[in-house]
Amino acid sequence: MQSSTAHPSRLALYARLVRIDKPIGTLLLLWPTLWAMWMAADGHPPPALVAIFVVGTVLMRSAGCAINDWADRDFDKHVKRTRERPLTAGLIAPWEALAVAAVLALVAFTLILPLNALTKWLSVAAVLIAGTYPFFKRFFAIPQAYLGIAFGFGIPMAYAAVQDQVPAPAWLMLAANVLWAIAYDTAYAMVDRDDDLLIGIQTSAITFGRFDVAAIMLCYAGFFGIMAWVGHALALGAAYWIGLAAAAALAGYYYTLLRTRDRMQCFFVFRHNNWFGACVFVGAALAYALR
């Protein structure tokens, strides 16, 4: 028993690498995909298609974690929250992280082989965006915007899979997701801001400085403006607007926590955005179900 504790199995280390024990990233990636799928299919997406996208989301988020740890391995050792990650701690080799990411991405791609060509081409773009995101922290002042594209690329893919096209509402939702990602990931970046300043990487929390909370709330406001337009364009019913109102109430609650700039409160806000995304989805799903 002691040996097992001291020397985790390779499988256990790979599970830690891809954050199996931390599903929040998967959920933040999944909600926008589900919003889009329900809207693209008028509330009745094929169950098999939903399953493909749910499993694909889990796989690609896991692959993204492995790539991120490989790219950030020299930075993570200087950050208290990340220095014990398997790759940073030297428990696995860099090539293993790349191999895990490649296998997961390949399995995810096999899931969409039955789908149309547009979806497949968009999946290639999604992989390129996910794979390059970690490097944007080296030079881009607000890498969270690029993260929002990566985490929202399930939106055009869902529309492509259902309609074989990507209409204006899909691109608007992607823009809304970028704003949402800046909001919740800036809260996350506020946790590590002091460490990030020391090691010299870029984050929105550093860029916004003392206007960090104001910027977060402005992003939430922009999100609601765009999603209100989408709801109007798609003639969604009262349930959708109730869902948006519930999400807005959560955003107001987040403000009361973020203004303290307490690290634990900021981390709580980041994690709690799962419920923000859920409110939007439940509202949209009910709006279609009640038609």
From Swiss-Prot:
Pfam assignment, any one: UbiA
Cell location: Cell inner membrane
The EC number(s) this enzyme carries: 2.5.1.39
Primary localization class, coarse: membrane
Pathway involvement of the protein, from the record: Cofactor biosynthesis; ubiquinone biosynthesis
Biological process (GO), any one: ubiquinone biosynthetic process
Superkingdom assignment: Bacteria
Bilayer topology annotation: Multi-pass membrane protein
TM segment ranges: 23-43, 47-67, 98-118, 139-159, 171-191, 216-236, 238-258, 267-287
UniProt-listed InterPro entries: HB_polyprenyltransferase-like, Prenyltransferase, UbiA_prenyltransferase, UbiA_prenylTrfase_CS, UbiA_sf
Keywords: Cell inner membrane, Cell membrane, Magnesium, Membrane, Transferase, Transmembrane, Transmembrane helix, Ubiquinone biosynthesis
Reactions the enzyme catalyzes: all-trans-octaprenyl diphosphate + 4-hydroxybenzoate = 4-hydroxy-3-(all-trans-octaprenyl)benzoate + diphosphate
One MF annotation (Gene Ontology) recorded for this entry: 4-hydroxybenzoate polyprenyltransferase activity
Names of the cofactor(s): Mg(2+)
Enzyme class per UniProt: transferase
A GO CC term attached to the entry: plasma membrane
Similarity comment text for this entry: Belongs to the UbiA prenyltransferase family.
NCBIfam families named in the record: ubiA_proteo
UniProt function note: Catalyzes the prenylation of para-hydroxybenzoate (PHB) with an all-trans polyprenyl group. Mediates the second step in the final reaction sequence of ubiquinone-8 (UQ-8) biosynthesis, which is the condensation of the polyisoprenoid side chain with PHB, generating the first membrane-bound Q intermediate 3-octaprenyl-4-hydroxybenzoate.
PANTHER family the UniProt entry points to: 4-HYDROXYBENZOATE POLYPRENYLTRANSFERASE, MITOCHONDRIAL, PRENYLTRANSFERASES
Protein name: 4-hydroxybenzoate octaprenyltransferase
Species in which this protein is naturally found: Ralstonia nicotianae (strain ATCC BAA-1114 / GMI1000)
Annotated gene: ubiA
